[in-house]
């Protein structure tokens, strides 16, 4: 599936190594390969955006290696493709040898997978399912500041799905563990791939059922009910968390205005 980059090859370039992304001038490179010293490297086309190919190049650059979070303000599709590239690069880097027999592996030519040349085992990129949920109580929404968000951003609750657990069970468990409350009338909204590091966010809306807020201090700095027209600093547009909050605000406006 991959090939040697030629001088006139062009498009968007996802140059990644160890979950980092090359961002010269803070931007995702776009243009001809020769402009970015990529001629002769191996590249894998991982998608297309606005009629232009999006290429993955597995390479470490000496400068300007950053986080895919830095391009979160891109068009949502291009951001997802950049995230795909970072995840695939890490998958290929970390699966050079078979976990069963220890022999060298090689990439499949027909799908995103690594194949063992000895025992024929097949490996696919790991995807970690997560839940994220907006909880409404009358004219208010539950928002929390996570320990990893020291910039004042408040968002909805989220967490990883555990082995042997349904998405609905994961919502109930995560909400109880992080905030101490129970929810009801759970409704699926949408999903979003989230490359931090390899998550698939499944988004829900729910209604408050019972209980008082008691936060898990290992996860949250605080959690409170916020009236829909008096909200703190929110996640950026384009994130599924922001969509859940905006959808909840729209429901409150329709009912209370």
Curated annotation (Swiss-Prot):
Residues engaged in binding a divalent metal cation 3: 174, 178, 219
Catalysed reaction, written as an equation: a 5'-end NAD(+)-phospho-ribonucleoside in mRNA + H2O = a 5'-end phospho-adenosine-phospho-ribonucleoside in mRNA + beta-nicotinamide D-ribonucleotide + 2 H(+); NAD(+) + H2O = beta-nicotinamide D-ribonucleotide + AMP + 2 H(+); NADH + H2O = reduced beta-nicotinamide D-ribonucleotide + AMP + 2 H(+)
Chain positions of motif Nudix box: 159-180
Binding annotation for a divalent metal cation 2: 174
Residues reported in the UniProt entry to bind a divalent metal cation 1: 158, 178, 219
Assigned keywords, A-Z: Hydrolase, Magnesium, Manganese, Metal-binding, NAD, Zinc
Residues engaged in binding substrate: 25, 69, 111, 124, 192-199, 241
Pfam family name, one: Zn_ribbon_NUD
Cofactor(s) needed: Mg(2+); Mn(2+); Zn(2+)
One Gene Ontology term, aspect cellular component: cytosol
PANTHER family hit by this protein: NAD-CAPPED RNA HYDROLASE NUDT12 (PTHR42904:SF6), NUDIX HYDROLASE, NUDC SUBFAMILY (PTHR42904)
Function (record text): mRNA decapping enzyme that specifically removes the nicotinamide adenine dinucleotide (NAD) cap from a subset of mRNAs by hydrolyzing the diphosphate linkage to produce nicotinamide mononucleotide (NMN) and 5' monophosphate mRNA. The NAD-cap is present at the 5'-end of some mRNAs and stabilizes RNA against 5'-processing. Has preference for mRNAs with a 5'-end purine. Catalyzes the hydrolysis of a broad range of dinucleotide pyrophosphates.
Protein name: NAD-capped RNA hydrolase NudC
Organism name: Shigella boydii serotype 18 (strain CDC 3083-94 / BS512)
């Amino acid at each position: 599936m991959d090939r040697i980059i030629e001088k006139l090859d062009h498009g968007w370039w996802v140059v990644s190594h160890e979950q980092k992304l090359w961002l010269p001038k803070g931007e995702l490179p776009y243009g001809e390969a020769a402009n970015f010293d990529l001629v002769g490297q191996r590249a894998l086309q991982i998608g297309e955006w606005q009629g232009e190919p999006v290429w993955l190049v597995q390479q470490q650059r000496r400068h300007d290696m950053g986080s895919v979070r830095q391009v979160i303000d891109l068009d949502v599709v291009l951001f997802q493709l950049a995230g795909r590239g970072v995840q695939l690069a890490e998958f290929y880097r970390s699966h050079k040898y078979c976990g069963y027999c220890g022999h060298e592996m090689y990439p499949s030519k027909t799908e995103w997978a690594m194949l063992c040349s000895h025992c024929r085992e097949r490996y696919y990129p790991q995807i970690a399912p997560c839940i994220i949920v907006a909880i409404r109580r009358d004219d208010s929404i539950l928002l929390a500041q996570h320990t990893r968000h020291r910039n004042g951003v408040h968002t909805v609750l989220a967490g990883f799905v555990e082995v042997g657990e349904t998405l609905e069970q994961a919502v109930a468990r995560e909400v109880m563990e992080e905030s101490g409350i129970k929810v009801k009338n759970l409704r699926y909204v949408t999903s979003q791939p989230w490359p931090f590091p390899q998550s698939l966010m499944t988004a829900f809306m729910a209604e408050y059922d019972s209980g008082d807020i008691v936060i898990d201090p290992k996860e949250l700095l605080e959690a409170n009910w916020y009236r829909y027209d008096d909200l703190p600093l929110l996640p950026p547009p384009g994130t599924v968390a922001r969509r859940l909050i905006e959808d909840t605000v729209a429901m409150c406006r329709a009912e209370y205005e």
